[in-house]
Regions:
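Short loop-beta-helix segment that forms the pyridoxal 5′-phosphate
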Residues: 1-18
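Conserved PLP-anchoring active-site segment centered on the Schiff-base-forming lysine
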Residues: 19-38, 59
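Substrate-binding/gating loop at the entrance of the active-site cleft, primarily
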Residues: 10-11, 31-47
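Conserved Walker B
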Residues: 35, 81, 109-111
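Active-site PLP attachment segment
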Residues: 119, 125-160
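Active-site phosphate-binding strand-loop segment of PLP-dependent enzymes
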Residues: 52-107
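Short, structured coil segments at secondary-structure junctions
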Residues: 47-48, 132
């Protein structure tokens, strides 16, 4: 995807914490799956956005929240494979909801990167949905056996984070 690039963080925790805090402001709405990782919860809490957790993998509940907030900036956040119980999100269904309600989709691929997809690119890659994911975050510390994490997003989002993401700016770079 030509208009995208990546940014590397020290860890998945640093990535989620800083990205969500930097991108979401007062008046915005973060809608997060109930079983999302603590780093996502902490990033949402540190932002000034309203934070609502929808019932795990419940698209009816998610759609109700989306439809009740038509005029707000909305960020849907989910893991592709959930660390809490190992099940998977319906990424195609989430892509449909984000389009229908003019929301952005943030996908944490920590537990699918290096496992799913023909080149280990994660579940969105395997499902051929990568172009529909606004923000993709994954870690090198699980299946890849390394250190750090990354975000893959449009150039303007990456450029913004380089200048505004505190967990990126105020951390020592990886060796």
């Amino acid at each position: 995807i030509d208009n995208r690039k990546a940014l590397v963080f020290n860890s998945g925790y640093h990535a989620n914490l800083g990205i969500i805090q930097a991108l979401c402001k007062k008046g915005d709405l973060i809608i997060s799956d109930k079983l999302n990782h603590a780093s996502i919860i902490d990033g949402a809490r540190l932002s000034e956005a309203e934070f609502i957790r929808y019932a795990h993998n419940d698209h009816v509940h998610l759609e109700k929240i989306l439809s009740d907030n038509p005029d707000r900036n909305k960020l849907i956040i989910t893991e592709s494979v959930f660390s809490m119980d190992g099940d998977s999100a319906d990424i195609a269904g989430l892509c449909e909801l984000k389009k229908k309600y003019n929301a952005m989709l943030y996908l944490d691929e920590a537990h699918s990167f290096g496992v799913y997809g023909s080149n280990g690119g994660g579940m969105a890659s395997e499902l051929n949905l990568l172009s529909q994911i606004d923000i993709l975050v994954a870690t090198f510390g699980k299946a890849a056996g390394g250190v750090g994490a990354f975000i893959y997003a449009e150039n303007n989002i990456i450029d913004y984070l380089i200048n505004k993401c505190r967990s990126f700016i105020y951390s020592t770079a990886l060796p």
